[in-house]
C-alpha cells in the first residue's frame, strides 16, 4: 500500500463519515496525507514509523468514539421506525401524534411528555396548570427533574424539587428552590413569589432573580413582609403565560426597564431554554393531518445524548512546504454531530454529517505591510466538503429550490401559507404576512452573545424598535433597507480553557510578536508565543478571538466571577466635586488631529497639569521623558500598535484563503471575511468617518465572534442561505428569492504597548499585555462611615466572592456624661454616596461589622454593644465565608446583634473586683449573611485581650493576645470551661485554637511565670496568621528576659525554645528592674500547638504611649503595633515602627544568629518591612522614612507574593526605599497627618504608592487584598473632606466629612497598561489575548464622553483583570453603553 494511504479497520455495522480528504472503501477508512506534510527526506525510518504509529492511534481513538456514538443513534432511529410502523407513539419529544384532532383521540398525549400536540400533559411548564402557577411547573408527580428528563423544569429552572417531593413548588409546599433558582423563601415561609407578593428573598435580600431565574419581574414590589422591607424586589404579577422555564417555554416579550429587581435596574430578560412555536395544550388550531415536527424544538438538556466528538494527538512534528506555510500533525480530526434536526426519513442511507478539523500554523514575517487577511467563507466550506451558497433566479420555479436550502423568515409564527414553495409550514399559520418587520435586541445576561426578539408590534410596519439597545436604523448615519434584523442564539457549546475545545471547528496558530515570549502564565497555552485564531464552522462564521469563548459556564454567564451580572453594575454619586461631563478630562471631545498636534508638542509639565482626574495616558510619558507618546504613521491613523505581520508567502492555508495587502485601511489591523448575516436586498456603501480617515461603517449587524446565526424561526442557518420576501402580500404567484449571504469583512486591531488608543473603527481590539509588573494604581471606589467620633480599631478582610467585611468602633456620645440626645447617628454610606444604614448607639462605644459587595454596595450590618478600654477588634473569614469577630470588654455586659437587628446573645457583666477593672474577651461567629452562629468567652478576674484572629482551611479558628493578673479560662461555645493558663503579675502571651463549632482544641502561652516582676515582664501577642505550610505564625513584643515558649495543648510544658532580650535599658518599678525597650518576636507553631522555631528583631522599637508619640500624633493612640502577612510560598513579612537605629535582625534558631541585614533611622519614627523565609531566616529588609514620623499598621500579600503596606505619616516628604537601598518615589504631605499605601514586589522593590489626605488627620488603619488582587484600605479622617489620589499623584476621588472623625473604605487596583477609548459609531469588542496575559490588569478610560452600564450608571472607565476579560460596547451618540462584560472591574466617579 502506498505510504501516503493509511488503513484503519472499522467495526461491523458502523458507518464512517467521509469528506474530500478521506475515502471509505471496503470497510476501511483511507486517509490521504497531504504532500506538504510527508515525512522529511532526512527523517530516519524509526522517526517515520513512530509518527505513523501516533497518527494511527489517534485515528483509532477518534473512530471508536464515532462508531459508538453513531451506533447508539442508529438504534434509537430504528426503534422509532418500528414504533411508527406499528402506529403507536411512545410520547417522546420526537414522536408524532396520529391526528391533530381532539385530545381524547390521542392516547399518546395522556402521559407526561413534551409533545406540543398533547393537551393533557401532567409535567412540564404549561400555561394551563390551573392549580399551580404556570412558571412553577407541575403540581403532581415525582418529576425529577434530571438532565434529559421529560418532566419539570430543567437545570436553571425556578422550582426545585426538594428531596422526595413533587416537581413543585406549589401552594403549601416546602421552600425551594435549590441553587440555580430565582429566589429563596421568606424566612420561615413558603416559596415565593405569589400574585401580589414579593419575591421572598433570603434575609439581607434583594431577591434576584439570578441568572437563569424565571420571573421578570413584571412590577416592582415595595411593601413590607414579615417586618422586612424589600424595596423593588418584585414581582407583583405572575410570569408570562408561556415559559420561561423548561425546554419548550420561551419568553417572547422583554421585561421593560425600571421594573427591578434591583433599585434602578434595567429590563430583565427571560432565559433562552428553547423556543415554542405554539402554546401548549391548545390543539384547536391544528389542521387535519400530521402534526409537523419543528426544528431545534428541544433544549440543550434534551440534546445531551448528542455529544460532541473530539480527539487529540500528542505528536508535535511539523513539516513545511515550499510556499512557506506550515501545517502541524498534532491536530487530529475532530468532528461534531450538528444536524440534530435532520429528517429521519433519510437515515436509511446512513448519511452522517462529518466535519474534519485541522490545525495549521502561520509564522510572522517581517513584512508589516501585509497585516490584513481576507478569508472567504466559501473557500472554507469547500475545503470541508460543505455546499457553498447559491443564488437562484427569482423567476425559476419552486421545484428548482433544494429543500435543504430553504429557511423561512417568520413573523409571529405566521408565514406565507398559500405559497406552494413554502417549506416547513406551520400548521397554524395564516395567509397574511407582515409588510415590514424589525426585531428588538434582547439583553441576555447569561451569554456574551446578543439575543434578539421580535417586536411586540411585529405585524405592524415599524421603522425601528424603541428599546435602549435596539437594532436601530441609524447607528452610523446609514439606513437599513431590510425586513429583518438578525436573531442570535447562544451556541450549543462554549469554549473552555482548552484551545482544542470541541466547539472550535478549526484552529489556526498564528505567531505573535516577541512581546509575548516572556509570558510566564503557562496555564493558558502549550506555546506562550502562539496566538490562536479560531475558525468556527457551526454557522459559517469565523472566530478570530481565542479568548471570547473561554471560561464560561453552562449558563453562559459572562460575569462568572460575580453573583449576578446585573448586581455588578452600580452607580456612584458625585460627592464634593462636581463631575461635569462638559468640562473635565473624562468628557472632553478631543479630536484626532488635536491629539496628534498636542502629542508632538506637549512637554512633561503640561502633560501632568492637564491630567486632572488621574488619566494615565500622559503620566506614562512624563515618567519616561517622552514627548511623542503616539507617533503618527503615514496613514494618519492613531493605531500605533505593534502589528501582527503576515507575509505574502505565509497564509493560513493555501487551500483556504490568500493573504493580501489592503492599503486603504489601517496596516495594523487584521480583517477576516464573515458571512453576511443581514437579510437585505440592498446594501448602501455609506461611510462613517473615524479619526481623520474614512472606513466603511457596516450597516450589517455586528456579529460577536464565534456566534451561530439563526433565523426568526430558530432554524439553524447551516447552508448560509436565507429567504427574502419581496412583497408584503402572500399571493400565490410570488416565490421566495433565495440569495447567498454576502461575505462581510470583520476587522481586528492588536495593542501590545503600555499606552495606546483603542481604535473604534475595527470590530475587535485584542490586547497583549506588555509586562507583568504593575507600577501604577488607580482608585476604583470609596465609601465612608459617618460620625464614628473616634479613630481607632478599624479592620478589614475579604471573602471568596470578593465581598468586603469591615469592623471597627464608633462612639455614641462625645460628651463627658453619656447622653443620646441630639447626638447624630452613625451613618453607613455605600460607594455611590448614599446613606444606607443609620446606627443609633445605646452605649458609650460600640463595635460595628459592615459587609459590602465588591463594588462597595451595602449588604448587611451587625453590632456589639458594651464598654471598651482596649479598642482592639479583629476580623477573619473562613473557607465558607463565615465571619469571625473578636473583641474585649471591661466591667460591663455585652449585647450581640446580628444582621437582622435582633439581640441574639447577652454576655453578663463580670463580677467586679474591688481593686482593679476586669477585662474579658469574646469570639463571635456569623454566617455569610450575618446570621449569628455562636459565641465563646475568655473568662478571667484580671485582664484578657484578644488582639488578632485567623482561620485555616478546615475552618478552625486561632487567636492570640495577652492576659495578666489572674488565671485565664477558655470557655467553649456552649459555655463550658476548657483549658486554663496560670496567673501572672504582669502580662503573658496566649495562643489558642478552636474548631469550627467553637470548642477549644488547645491553648499555650509565651512568657515567664517567675517569682519576681523582672522575670515576668510585659509580653503581648499582636498578630496571628495561618501559613500555607500548615503552621501558625504569631508576632508580638516582649521585655521578659528570657521569653519562654510553651507547647500545647495546655501550655504547661516548655518547648525548649526561648528568646533573650538584647536591650539593657531598665527602669525600677517597686524594686524590680523592668526593661522599657521591648524586642519583637516571631514564633511558628504547628497546628497542634507545639512550637517549631522563634526569632526576634531588636533595636529601639517604638511604643506609642511615649512623650514623643503623644506630641507627634496628639496622643491619638496608645497601642504598640506590629503586624504580619504570609505569602503563597509561606514566607513571612512583618512590619512595624522604630525610633532609633540600627535595627538588628536575627535568624533562627531562637534568634541567636545576627543577620547581615540592618536598618538605619531617618527622622523621628520610621517603618520597617522585613521578609523571612518559612524557616525564620531573614531574606531582605527595607524602610519608609522621612524628616518626622512614618507609621505602618497594616500589611497584606497578593497571589503573586507582592506585598502591600498601609499606614500614615507626618513628614513633609516621605521616602519609600526598596530593599536594595534605592528610592523610586516619594509622597508629599500638605496636612497634619496623611495616609499612605505602598506596594512592593516579592524582592522588596517598591512599585507604587498612593495617599489619602485632607486638611486635618487621615490615617490608614488596615489593608486587605481580594481574589482579584485589588487592594482594600480602611481608615479614618477628620475635620475636612478626604482626597484620594492615584499613583500618578492626581486626585481621583473626594468624600466630605460628617463629624469629628469619619471612617472610610477605599478600593484600589493597579495595572500595566493605560488605554484610551475613542469615540465610535458601531459595536466595539475588546478582549485580553489569553496567550499574552501577564497576570496583571489593563486600564481603559474614555475622555470624549461617558461610559454607562445597563442601569445607566456613569463610569470613569474599567479594568480588565483576567486572561478571559472581555467587554462589548455599543455606541450611543458620543457615549458608550456596556452591553456585556466578563471579568471587568468598573471604575466609578
From Swiss-Prot:
**Does this entry carry the keyword Ribonucleoprotein?**
no
State where the protein is found: Virion
Region annotation Disordered: residue ranges?
294-353
Q: Which UniProt keywords apply?
A: Coiled coil, Repeat, Virion, WD repeat
- Where are the WD-type repeats located? 867-907, 1017-1056, 1115-1156
Q: Where is it mainly found?
A: virion
State whether keyword Cell membrane applies: no
In the UniProt record, which is one GO cellular component term?
A: virion component
Q: For bias kind Low complexity, which ranges apply?
A: 304-314, 322-335
What are the coiled-coil residue ranges? 43-94
Q: What InterPro entries does this protein's entry cite?
A: Motility_Chemotaxis_Reg, Quinoprotein_ADH-like_sf
Quote the PANTHER family the UniProt record gives: CELL SURFACE GLYCOPROTEIN (S-LAYER PROTEIN)-LIKE PROTEIN, PHYTASE-LIKE DOMAIN-CONTAINING PROTEIN
For this entry, the protein name equals: Uncharacterized WD repeat-containing protein L264
- Report the source organism: Acanthamoeba polyphaga mimivirus (APMV)
Amino acid at each position: 500500500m502506498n505510504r501516503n494511504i493509511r488503513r484503519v479497520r472499522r467495526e461491523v455495522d458502523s458507518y464512517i463519515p467521509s469528506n474530500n480528504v478521506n475515502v471509505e472503501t471496503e470497510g476501511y477508512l483511507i486517509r490521504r496525507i497531504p504532500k506538504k506534510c510527508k515525512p522529511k527526506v532526512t527523517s530516519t525510518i524509526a522517526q517515520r514509523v513512530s509518527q505513523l504509529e501516533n497518527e494511527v492511534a489517534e485515528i483509532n481513538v477518534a473512530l471508536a468514539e464515532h462508531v459508538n456514538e453513531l451506533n447508539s443513534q442508529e438504534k434509537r432511529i430504528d426503534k422509532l421506525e418500528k414504533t411508527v410502523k406499528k402506529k403507536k407513539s411512545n410520547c417522546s419529544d420526537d414522536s408524532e401524534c396520529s391526528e391533530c384532532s381532539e385530545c381524547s383521540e390521542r392516547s399518546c398525549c395522556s402521559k407526561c411528555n413534551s409533545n406540543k400536540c398533547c393537551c393533557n400533559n401532567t409535567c412540564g411548564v404549561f400555561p394551563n396548570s390551573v392549580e399551580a402557577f404556570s412558571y412553577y411547573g407541575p403540581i403532581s408527580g415525582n418529576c425529577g427533574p434530571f438532565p434529559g428528563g421529560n418532566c419539570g423544569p430543567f437545570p436553571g429552572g425556578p422550582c426545585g424539587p426538594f428531596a422526595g417531593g413533587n416537581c413543585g413548588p406549589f401552594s403549601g409546599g416546602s421552600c425551594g428552590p435549590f441553587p440555580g433558582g430565582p429566589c429563596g423563601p421568606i424566612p420561615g415561609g413558603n416559596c415565593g413569589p405569589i400574585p401580589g407578593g414579593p419575591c421572598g428573598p433570603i434575609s439581607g435580600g434583594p431577591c434576584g432573580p439570578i441568572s437563569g431565574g424565571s420571573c421578570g419581574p413584571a412590577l416592582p414590589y415595595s411593601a413590607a413582609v414579615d417586618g422586612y422591607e424589600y424595596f423593588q424586589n418584585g414581582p407583583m404579577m405572575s410570569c408570562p403565560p408561556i415559559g420561561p422555564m423548561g425546554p419548550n417555554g420561551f419568553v417572547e416579550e422583554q421585561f421593560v426597564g425600571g421594573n427591578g429587581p434591583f433599585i434602578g435596574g434595567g429590563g430583565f430578560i427571560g432565559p433562552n431554554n428553547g423556543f415554542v412555536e405554539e402554546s401548549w395544550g391548545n390543539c384547536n388550531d391544528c389542521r387535519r393531518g400530521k402534526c409537523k415536527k419543528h426544528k431545534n424544538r428541544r433544549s440543550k438538556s434534551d440534546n445531551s445524548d448528542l455529544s460532541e466528538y473530539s480527539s487529540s494527538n500528542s505528536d508535535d512534528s511539523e513539516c513545511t512546504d515550499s510556499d512557506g506555510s506550515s501545517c502541524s500533525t498534532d491536530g487530529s480530526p475532530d468532528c461534531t454531530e450538528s444536524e440534530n434536526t435532520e429528517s429521519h426519513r433519510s437515515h436509511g442511507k446512513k448519511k452522517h454529517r462529518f466535519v474534519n478539523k485541522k490545525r495549521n500554523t502561520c509564522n510572522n514575517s517581517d513584512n508589516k505591510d501585509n497585516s490584513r487577511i481576507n478569508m472567504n467563507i466559501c473557500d472554507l466550506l469547500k475545503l470541508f466538503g460543505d455546499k457553498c451558497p447559491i443564488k437562484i433566479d427569482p423567476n425559476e420555479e419552486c421545484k428548482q429550490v433544494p429543500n435543504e436550502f430553504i429557511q423561512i423568515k417568520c413573523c409571529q409564527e405566521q408565514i406565507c401559507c398559500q405559497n406552494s414553495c413554502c417549506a416547513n409550514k406551520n400548521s397554524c399559520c395564516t395567509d397574511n404576512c407582515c409588510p415590514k418587520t424589525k426585531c428588538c435586541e434582547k439583553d441576555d445576561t447569561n451569554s456574551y452573545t446578543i439575543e434578539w426578539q421580535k417586536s411586540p408590534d411585529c405585524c405592524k410596519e415599524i421603522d425601528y424598535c424603541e428599546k435602549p439597545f435596539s437594532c436601530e436604523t441609524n447607528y452610523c448615519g446609514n439606513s437599513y433597507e431590510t425586513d429583518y434584523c438578525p436573531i442570535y442564539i447562544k451556541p450549543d457549546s462554549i469554549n473552555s480553557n482548552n484551545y482544542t475545545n470541541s466547539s472550535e471547528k478549526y484552529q489556526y496558530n498564528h505567531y505573535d510578536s516577541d512581546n509575548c515570549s516572556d509570558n510566564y502564565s503557562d496555564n493558558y497555552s502549550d506555546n506562550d508565543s502562539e496566538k490562536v485564531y479560531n475558525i468556527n464552522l457551526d454557522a459559517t462564521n469565523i472566530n478570530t478571538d481565542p479568548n471570547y469563548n473561554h471560561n464560561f459556564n453552562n449558563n453562559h454567564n459572562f460575569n462568572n466571577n460575580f453573583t449576578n451580572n446585573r448586581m455588578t453594575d452600580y452607580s456612584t454619586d458625585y460627592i464634593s466635586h462636581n463631575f461635569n461631563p462638559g468640562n473635565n478630562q473624562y468628557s472632553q471631545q478631543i479630536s484626532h488631529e488635536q491629539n496628534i498636534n498636542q502629542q508632538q508638542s506637549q512637554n512633561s509639565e503640561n502633560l501632568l497639569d492637564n491630567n486632572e482626574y488621574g488619566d494615565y495616558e500622559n503620566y506614562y510619558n512624563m515618567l519616561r521623558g517622552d514627548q511623542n507618546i503616539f507617533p503618527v504613521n503615514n496613514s494618519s491613523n492613531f493605531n500605533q500598535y505593534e502589528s501582527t505581520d503576515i507575509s505574502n508567502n505565509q497564509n493560513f492555508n493555501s487551500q483556504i484563503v490568500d493573504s493580501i495587502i489592503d492599503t486603504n485601511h489601517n496596516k495594523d489591523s487584521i480583517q477576516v471575511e464573515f458571512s453576511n448575516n443581514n437579510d437585505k436586498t440592498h446594501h448602501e456603501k455609506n461611510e462613517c468617518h473615524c479619526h481623520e480617515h474614512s472606513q466603511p461603517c457596516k450597516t450589517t449587524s455586528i456579529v460577536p465572534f464565534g456566534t451561530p446565526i439563526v433565523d426568526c424561526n430558530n432554524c439553524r442557518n447551516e447552508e448560509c442561505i436565507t429567504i427574502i420576501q419581496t412583497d408584503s402580500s402572500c399571493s400565490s404567484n410570488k416565490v421566495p428569492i433565495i440569495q447567498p449571504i454576502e461575505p462581510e469583512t470583520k476587522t481586528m486591531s492588536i495593542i501590545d504597548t503600555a499606552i495606546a488608543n483603542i481604535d473604534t473603527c475595527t470590530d475587535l481590539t485584542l490586547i497583549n499585555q506588555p509586562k507583568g509588573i504593575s507600577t501604577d494604581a488607580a482608585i476604583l471606589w470609596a465609601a465612608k462611615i459617618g460620625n464614628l467620633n473616634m479613630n481607632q480599631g478599624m479592620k478589614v478582610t475579604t471573602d471568596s466572592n470578593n465581598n468586603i467585611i469591615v469592623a471597627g468602633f464608633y462612639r455614641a456620645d462625645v460628651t463627658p456624661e453619656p447622653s443620646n440626645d441630639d447626638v447624630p447617628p452613625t451613618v453607613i454610606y455605600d460607594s455611590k454616596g448614599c446613606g444606607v444604614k443609620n446606627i443609633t448607639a445605646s452605649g458609650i462605644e460600640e463595635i460595628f461589622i459592615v459587609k459590602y459587595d465588591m463594588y462597595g454596595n451595602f449588604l448587611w450590618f451587625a453590632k456589639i454593644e458594651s464598654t471598651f478600654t482596649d479598642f482592639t477588634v479583629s476580623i477573619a473569614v473562613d473557607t465558607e465565608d463565615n465571619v469571625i469577630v473578636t473583641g474585649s470588654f471591661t466591667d460591663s455586659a455585652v449585647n450581640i446583634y446580628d444582621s437582622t437587628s435582633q439581640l441574639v446573645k447577652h454576655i453578663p457583666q463580670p463580677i467586679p473586683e474591688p481593686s482593679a477593672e476586669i477585662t474579658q474577651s469574646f469570639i463571635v461567629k456569623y454566617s455569610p449573611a450575618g446570621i449569628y452562629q455562636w459565641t465563646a468567652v475568655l473568662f478571667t478576674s484580671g485582664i484578657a485581650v484578644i488582639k488578632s484572629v485567623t482561620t485555616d482551611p478546615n475552618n478552625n479558628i486561632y487567636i492570640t493576645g495577652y492576659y495578666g493578673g489572674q488565671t485565664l479560662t477558655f470557655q467553649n461555645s456552649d459555655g463550658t470551661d476548657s483549658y486554663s493558663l496560670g496567673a501572672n503579675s504582669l502580662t503573658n502571651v496566649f495562643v489558642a485554637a478552636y474548631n469550627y463549632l467553637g470548642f477549644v482544641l488547645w491553648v499555650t502561652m509565651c512568657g515567664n511565670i517567675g517569682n519576681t516582676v523582672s522575670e515576668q515582664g510585659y509580653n503581648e501577642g499582636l498578630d496571628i496568621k495561618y501559613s500555607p505550610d500548615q503552621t501558625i505564625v504569631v508576632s508580638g513584643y516582649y521585655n521578659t528576659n528570657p521569653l519562654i515558649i510553651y507547647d500545647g495543648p495546655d501550655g504547661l510544658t516548655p518547648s525548649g525554645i526561648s528568646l533573650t532580650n538584647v536591650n539593657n535599658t531598665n527602669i525600677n518599678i517597686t524594686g524590680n528592674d523592668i526593661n522599657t525597650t521591648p524586642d519583637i518576636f516571631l514564633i511558628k507553631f504547628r497546628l497542634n500547638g507545639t512550637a517549631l522555631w522563634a526569632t526576634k528583631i531588636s533595636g529601639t522599637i517604638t511604643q506609642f504611649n511615649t512623650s514623643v508619640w503623644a506630641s507627634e500624633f496628639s496622643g491619638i493612640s496608645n497601642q504598640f503595633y506590629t503586624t504580619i502577612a504570609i505569602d503563597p510560598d509561606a514566607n513571612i513579612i512583618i512590619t512595624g515602627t522604630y525610633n532609633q537605629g540600627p535595627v538588628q535582625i536575627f535568624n533562627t534558631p531562637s534568634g541567636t544568629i545576627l543577620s547581615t541585614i540592618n536598618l538605619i533611622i531617618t527622622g523621628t519614627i520610621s517603618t520597617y518591612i522585613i521578609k523571612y523565609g518559612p524557616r525564620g531566616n531573614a531574606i531582605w529588609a527595607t524602610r519608609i522614612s522621612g524628616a518626622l514620623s512614618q507609621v505602618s499598621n497594616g500589611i497584606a500579600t497578593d497571589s503573586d507574593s507582592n506585598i502591600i503596606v498601609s499606614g500614615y505619616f507626618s513628614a513633609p516628604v516621605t521616602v519609600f526605599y526598596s530593599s536594595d537601598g534605592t528610592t523610586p518615589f516619594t509622597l508629599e504631605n500638605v496636612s497634619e497627618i496623611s495616609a499612605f499605601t505602598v506596594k512592593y514586589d516579592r524582592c522588596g522593590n517598591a512599585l507604587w504608592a498612593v495617599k489619602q489626605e485632607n486638611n486635618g488627620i487621615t490615617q490608614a488603619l488596615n489593608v486587605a487584598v481580594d481574589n482579584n488582587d485589588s487592594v482594600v484600605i480602611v481608615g479614618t479622617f477628620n475635620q475636612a473632606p478626604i482626597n484620594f489620589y492615584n499613583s500618578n499623584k492626581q486626585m481621583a476621588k473626594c468624600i466630605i466629612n460628617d463629624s469629628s472623625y469619619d471612617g472610610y473604605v477605599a478600593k484600589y487596583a493597579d495595572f500595566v497598561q493605560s488605554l484610551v477609548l475613542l469615540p465610535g459609531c458601531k459595536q466595539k469588542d475588546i478582549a485580553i489575548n489569553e496567550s499574552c496575559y501577564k497576570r496583571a490588569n489593563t486600564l481603559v478610560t474614555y475622555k470624549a464622553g461617558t461610559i454607562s452600564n445597563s442601569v445607566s450608571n456613569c463610569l470613569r472607565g474599567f479594568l480588565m483583570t483576567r486572561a478571559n476579560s472581555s467587554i462589548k460596547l455599543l455606541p450611543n451618540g458620543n457615549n458608550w453603553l456596556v452591553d456585556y462584560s466578563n471579568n471587568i472591574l468598573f471604575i466609578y466617579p
